[in-house]
Amino acid sequence: YTNTNIKTPTNIKTKATLINKDGDILYSHYGNNMGDPLKSVIEIVKDVYSKMPEKAYIAKSTATGYGEHLIKAALGVDFGEIETMAHYKAAEKILPGVEFILDIGGQDMKCMRVKDGEIESILLNEACSSGCGSFIQNFANALGMQPEEFAQIGLSAKSPVDLGSRCTVFMNSRVKQAQKEGASVADISAGLSYSVVKNALFKVIKIRDPKQMGEKIIVQGGTFLNNSVLRAFELTCGREVVRPDKAGLMGAYGSALVALSRDDGKGSTLAPLEKLENFTIQKTTARCGRCSNNCLLTISKFADGTRYITNNRCERGAGLG
């Protein structure tokens, strides 16, 4: 008995989890999609099928993230879920009564305040990556280091460089200046970790007092797998927080929990292995012409006749193709 989720963002990562009826993770994937999330998801699902015991089956499936609708149309995924709700479901499962959730991914950031079991407010930052994981990764690459190695070195910093929380352009200049002044790689790494945290707390969330976060705090997202960022957060806000061991999979895990909660015993509509082995997609373009926007639509046609339309700026173009 299994429920599966696929988180399909438009950035470089695709995540997936497979759980049993008790919510335990049986299988997970966290990796680059090389710019083709649909192909990545197909390979993940095929891998799941190949590893399932003979009598096991997929009970229900859920997709979330920016690629949700494409994956649903292409692969027959049962449900879609709003990404913030998926993250909340996972956080509540791990820390019942959670009051504050901060998720920092590779290119975006989201913060949720929870009161009495309901999401009270949501803050998002998708316009600038200066406070996200790709920001640190780029600096690590520039220094010829792996992000994991760069993060670990930051834990041994003696005098973290104060880099502020400005945009990447200014930060590049500040890092170069720090290097000229003799700052160590460890101090630069720790300084960047503090910058990520300060950007989240003081620019995105605009928090004035750490007490506003409550007592039950979860941090998640791939960026918090960086121990230096985790420690910088704890020192900045003056309290311990919970970082799940599945911090980079929380959206996928939460959506799998959604699939579990919606299981009606009728089985899943997720494409079987035979269909995935023969999967094809044909893309064409067409002008809508149903309103003054005159959108140039991209029409994706799948082998079973299903169509998925993008680039329409209103609902009138959704039925073409």
Model-assigned labels for residue ranges:
Residues 1-24, 98-118, 287, 291, ...:
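Gly/Thr-rich phosphate-binding beta-strand-loop-beta motif of the actin/hexokinase/Hsp70
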